[in-house]
Amino acid sequence: MPKARVYELAKELGVDSKTVLSKLEAMGEFVKSASSTVEPPVARKLRNAFASSGQGNASDSKKPGHTAKKPAEPASHSMPKPAAPSAPKPAAPAAPKPRHAASKSDAPKPGHRAPRPGESRQHGNRPNGNAPRPQGGDRRQSGRPTAVPGARPQHGNAPQGGNNANGAKPHTPGPRPGNNPFSRKQGMHTPTPGDIPRPHPMNRPSVNNGEGRRGGRPGQGGGQRGGFRGRPGQGGAKPGQWGQHRPGQGGGQRPAGGGNRFGGNGGGFQGGNSAPSNGPARGGRGRGGAAGAFGRQGGKSSKARKNRLAKRQEFQEMKAPVIGGVRIPTGNGQEVRLRQGASLADLAEKINVNPAALVTVLFHLGEMATATQSLDEATFQILGEEIGWNIKIVSAEEEDKELLQQFDINLDEEELQEDGDLKPRPPVVTVMGHVDHGKTRLLDTIRRTNVIEGEAGGITQRIGAYQVTVNLEGEPRKITFLDTPGHEAFTAMRARGAELTDVAILVVAADDGVMPQTVEAINHAQAAHVPIVVAVNKIDKPGANPDKVRGQLTEYGLVPEEYGGNTMFVDISAKQGTNVDKLLEAVLLTADAELDLRANPDMDARGATVEARLDKGRGAVATVLVQSGTLHIGDAIVAGTSYGRVRAMLDENGNHMQEAGPSTPVQVLGLTSVPTAGDLFLVASDDRTARQIAEKRQATERAAQLAKRRKVVSLESLKEQFAKSEVDMLNIVIKGDSSGSVEALEDSLMKIEVSDEVGIQVIHRGVGAITQNDVNLATVDKAVIIGFNVRPNRQVADLAEREGVEIKYYSIIYKAIEDIEASLKGMLKPEYEEVVTSHSEIREIFRSSKFGNIAGVMVQDGEVKRGTKCRILRNGIATVNDLEISSLRRFKDDVTSVKEGYEAGINLGTFNDIEIGDIIETFEMQEIERK
């Protein structure tokens, strides 16, 4: 059914549009103007409201293709009182007459079975024209009879209309269109004033709250079809009780041949409801009207119905402010929590709006983004201020804590432990300092092993974790050591080591003194509130000056005890092993004096990943430091985005362990992937929980990376960005032997800045050998593969050679940085400068019909070459630039060049504007090196 507009309804009801708008507003329906459309249920309510108030001309709704009929007036104001009821009795089929008043006797009698909805077509006969009419007086209303709402046709086994059971006040019938959609008057019977019946009330058995028979199936109306007899026992309803009927119940009686064009009742309402003038129609789901003459569905579409929630939401949207052409419900300062890397779709789900509306608002604010694109915090803040929501981006720590709380895991559980459950644990000591100041040599001396020979260039490329036993006053004490790199590329790894440690040993060479990485190590330790023990190393070397080191460190807040401070200094020689035992005693004394190192070994293990790598035979191998609890073989663990079950545990010497207590470093086997160095690990209740936590972290990490990479495109800078040439990117695939080395190499490469014209993009990073997938990825993206302490097998190397993929191998990190920086400089677009090669004076002009003007010149300096660029200088002013020497002759011979002091003939192609005395200056564009 097409939607009616407000001015059409006003014209139909006989009132002005302002009255209709006021009425709609009073009904709770907010319409903008007289040209706005109104839903069919709302139009029906409007007609009922005008009919009940006696204002306007209430008429039935119009079916598609029907013209509006003159509305009926309530008969209760002028109709005579019906006669006394008479006993119901069967009557012969009634002849086609105008509609009669409905009566309760239309319902089936007790003991009679109500016919099924489909029986009317099979058993219904044409009405008999000899049936008597109900008694009633004649009356005129506005020159034509009025329709009687609620009246139903007389049926073969129903009591006659003259025997009404109660004092119903019927309406006089009005004409209805025929069943033929091509003729409006087929089957029409226009009654005369004498034909208007006067109904008589009669008793009606089996009445339920005054309601008539239940409606037929959807699309089948209660009114009788034109030319067919109604079903036996089909009841009507009392006028004034239409508000109690469901949609789909029968409507009024219809004369023979006067059925609705689309079937259903004569009221014209979908679902079989007529439009009474004395009661509002109820909503809800009914059985609908008849299917119509040509099988069209007469019932109301379920999509067109609106429940209260939809109307309330529509009302709220109408009150919402309009931004960029869309309505967004204002938040009034309410807080919305979003994770890092969230998209507009995530925000739309939180505030219950359409994501497309937020895209439009963001575009209105000058930024373009898709609904699923990750946005940064600044963009969300701008959007939140515009729509009235306080958008708060949850930090990674808070988000991870909320994630674990979903699985009943409390990270603050250890703080709630009772003192009786806590037991002493060994201190975790980090060895920090500048590169090549002897950190690894010191650990080598402590552990009595030789690990420095395995490090490329004598530089530690990864974090090592070891545990040693020290005798302090005859009592064995354990100390856990972490070795952090000293190279400047490993800033993140030093910071991570400071976060895991309890006491820091700062190694400073006595001959070098304080260096840049020494200051950085001090800052990391002080930021983590870690006590520092200074080891002044290399005191056995010539030129060593420990007092100079003490004086330099005083400037950074490390005052020795002999100077009145609280920092312990120990002069050692890691190579000779001098005073190493005193250094260990100083570490234990500092830990006992300043720290309360206790943990609960009976809880589930928690800790941090120190380093991780991919072993060819054992898979992912992670070195973890247990900080609290005890880790057992068979525990389900999750470390960052990796998860698995502990299959084996090894100590630093390769010995198998069954459990690992607090402050114990251990190698764990059994993870499905290689975790990142620094990821926290914890024990989950089962494998399923560990997998779900890891997968949720993977999704969060990916969204955060997308938000970090997102380039903000604003409308102001869009034209400028289009004008600029695209930046040439060097795509890189990084593979390394450990996660710490890969992380450090990536961070160092991303810091390289050569020019705005070139850049680096790491498209993939991973731990382990170079695989075929890496080569395929590099082939597609035209990338360079960097292998850090890893090599491909023969098949992968052959594939890379066939595909033309370059693989570079490095074992020292700064060598890789230098090569990549040189490659970026080679990618720069070349710059050119102009170099003048010769000057030639025109002394004669020869005119040729074939070649034009030919200049006879004398080469004054340099060398004139054919095909070079040139310009004309006249009185020292360049008249024409970007000419080309198309022909060069020496007498009658074509030559390629003419040197200084010789005469030549020069033709400049189609350019003939030359004069005697002009100078022809030749030049070349030579490429210069970019720096």
UniProtKB/Swiss-Prot annotation:
Gene Ontology annotations for the cellular component aspect, listed alphabetically:
cytosol
Q: Where is this region: G4?
A: 537-540
- Which keywords has UniProt assigned to this entry? Cytoplasm, GTP-binding, Initiation factor, Nucleotide-binding, Protein biosynthesis
**Low complexity compositional bias: what residue ranges?**
156-168
Domain tr-type G, first and last residues per copy: 424-596
Compartments, record wording? Cytoplasm
Does this entry carry the keyword RNA-binding? no
Identify one Pfam family in the record: IF-2
Residues binding GTP: 433-440, 483-487, 537-540
Which intervals of the chain are annotated as region Disordered?
A: 32-310
Polar residues composition-biased segments: 50-59
Chain intervals for the UniProt region annotation (G2):
458-462
Q: Which SUPFAM superfamilies match?
A: Initiation factor IF2/eIF5b, domain 3 (SSF52156), P-loop containing nucleoside triphosphate hydrolases (SSF52540), Translation proteins (SSF50447)
Region span, G1: 433-440
Location (main, coarse) = cytoplasm
- Give the residue ranges for region: G5: 573-575
Note down the stretches annotated as region G3. Answer: 483-486
**Job description of the protein:** One of the essential components for the initiation of protein synthesis. Protects formylmethionyl-tRNA from spontaneous hydrolysis and promotes its binding to the 30S ribosomal subunits. Also involved in the hydrolysis of GTP during the formation of the 70S ribosomal complex.
Q: Which PANTHER family match?
A: TR-TYPE G DOMAIN-CONTAINING PROTEIN, TRANSLATION INITIATION FACTOR IF-2-RELATED
The family annotation for this protein states: Belongs to the TRAFAC class translation factor GTPase superfamily. Classic translation factor GTPase family. IF-2 subfamily.
Q: What is this protein called?
A: Translation initiation factor IF-2
